[in-house]
Amino acid sequence: MSIEAETVKSTEKFALMVDLGIITVPDDYDHATRLTTFLERNRKKFYDVHNDITDKNFPSPSRILKPGDKLCVRAFEQVVGGTTTSEERMAFLETQGAVYTGAQGASILWDQRHDQLPKNKWYCSFDKKERLFKDADGIHRVPRIDIYYGGDFCFYLDLFERAWDVDSIILCFSDLSEPSEA
């Protein structure tokens, strides 16, 4: 199948679930320590946090954020039955002009919009496979924020190589700022 056909096929599988508006990277943002400071400040607000969500394991997402950056954030859901692949989801994100902000982007979204995320969903912050953390088993891991019906949150890692279902939501960050070098 051609790339164009795969892109068309991918766009038919996903639809906007919620537009989360614009988030702004805080003035005190430091990329090198973002995840450490975020978890120091918020760990008790999460039911669970994966131990591998660290600045060391996620040092270089495709889009390195800087203070003052503005990002439009939308969440897309799968609207077809069955499963989709990470490659299909990434192809869809490309059609949306997404930038990949990694665990850092997900943490800023949680700080600024967690109260607007529909419950009982898993919000995944995709990136190019080579930019993702690779665990001890050689598996690439995708950062995600889980929100359960009761309101509990988890900051977790999923498997890039897995089959995704309708509960796994795609976070789409669109850059409204001048790009920085990654």
Question: What do these predicted regions represent?
Answer:
Residues M1-V99, G105-A182:
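A binding-site-centric feature that preferentially detects glycan-recognition modules on secreted/surface proteins
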